[in-house]
């Protein structure tokens, strides 16, 4: 397919050429958005991100975060660069590069083509994707080894994603921006059909439908949500008892500040278990981070917990 026609599959009736306005939904979607913002804050001025958080509970994300930056000979979306840098921060890549498989081939040899094209960032890129999509990782097999370059192209096109009244509705965010996978594009087929590769806890399957999605066996996912979902685990705070928690609310602004405060409290050693957190007042937490709840003070705020691998 010609490149121009391919882009038309993604571009709909764009309300704004510069921003994507997102509204809170179910907690998994909300955690995906907050996790995405958390990763962006690693590479951007946090104040810029906080300006995106609106009083009506929405978040207005500037589309230029999906535009490409040059890494060696390859152009890579800035949002993906942030994720790669976040996932590899402080790691001794040399140790990983020297590791060998059963045939004696080192990781450095296996990923040489990425170093040739991207320089040192090529090593980080492969390592980061392995941390997301390899065996026993959060999104196992969602993006496979031969999909890595296609994955870059896919994220790049999020800068032109739009909403079209004709397209089908995304069953994660509710927007009319579902893109039908190309018949010969195995990556799109995996990304745009929500199943256990997106979330081992919540993804439905043809064999075991999930009640979280009204027992549907297949769910349509828009390109944006497919990318956001691979960030949801980064919104969770892990406690000493190995449980993980996320504070959910009908406002991205409230969620951003409350979960930030939760991380700060945990790092200072003031809470170690979910039980201790439940003893704290959500309003008290909000006041401590100077979040003026205003009309939101009666909102339905909930604490989502994950223990022993289950929510």
What does each model-identified segment do?
Residues 2-172, 179-183:
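N-terminal alpha-helical interaction blocks
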Residues 16, 32, 41, 58-60, ...:
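Generic serine detector
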Residues 165-181, 220-235:
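Extended amphipathic secondary-structure runs
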Residues 163, 173, 243-247:
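Beta-strand elements within well-structured catalytic alpha/beta cores of enzymes
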Residues 36, 42, 66, 86, ...:
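Phenylalanine-focused residue identity feature
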Residues 166-167, 174-212:
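Short recognition patches in nucleic-acid-associated and regulatory proteins
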């Amino acid at each position: 397919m010609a490149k121009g026609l391919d882009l038309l599959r993604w571009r709909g009736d764009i309300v704004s050429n510069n921003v994507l306005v997102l509204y809170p939904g179910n907690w998994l979607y909300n955690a995906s958005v907050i996790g995405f913002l958390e990763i962006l804050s690693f590479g951007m001025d946090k104040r810029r991100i906080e300006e995106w958080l609106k009083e009506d509970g929405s978040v207005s994300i500037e589309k230029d975060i999906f535009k490409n930056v040059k890494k060696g000979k390859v152009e890579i979306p800035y949002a993906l660069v942030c994720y790669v840098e976040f996932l590899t921060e402080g790691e001794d890549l040399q140790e990983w590069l020297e590791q060998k498989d059963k045939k004696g081939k080192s990781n450095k040899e296996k990923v040489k083509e990425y170093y040739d094209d991207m320089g040192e960032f090529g090593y980080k890129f492969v390592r980061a994707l392995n941390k997301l999509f390899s065996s026993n990782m959060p999104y196992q097999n969602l993006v496979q080894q031969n999909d890595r370059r296609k994955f870059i192209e896919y994220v790049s096109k999020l800068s032109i994603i739009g909403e079209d009244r004709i397209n089908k509705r995304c069953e994660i965010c509710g927007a009319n921006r579902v893109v039908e996978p190309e018949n010969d594009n195995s990556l799109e087929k995996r990304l745009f059909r929500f199943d256990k590769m997106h979330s081992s806890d919540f993804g439905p399957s043809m064999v075991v439908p999930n009640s979280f999605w009204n027992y549907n066996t297949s769910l349509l996912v828009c390109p944006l949500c497919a990318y956001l979902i691979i960030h949801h685990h980064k919104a969770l705070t892990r406690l000493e008892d190995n449980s993980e928690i996320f504070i959910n609310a009908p406002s991205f602004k409230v969620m951003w500040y409350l979960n930030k405060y939760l991380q700060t409290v945990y790092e200072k050693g003031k809470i170690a278990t979910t039980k201790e957190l439940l003893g704290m007042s959500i309003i008290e937490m909000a006041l401590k981070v100077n979040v003026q709840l205003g009309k939101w003070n009666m909102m339905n705020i909930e604490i989502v917990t994950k223990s022993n691998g289950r929510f």
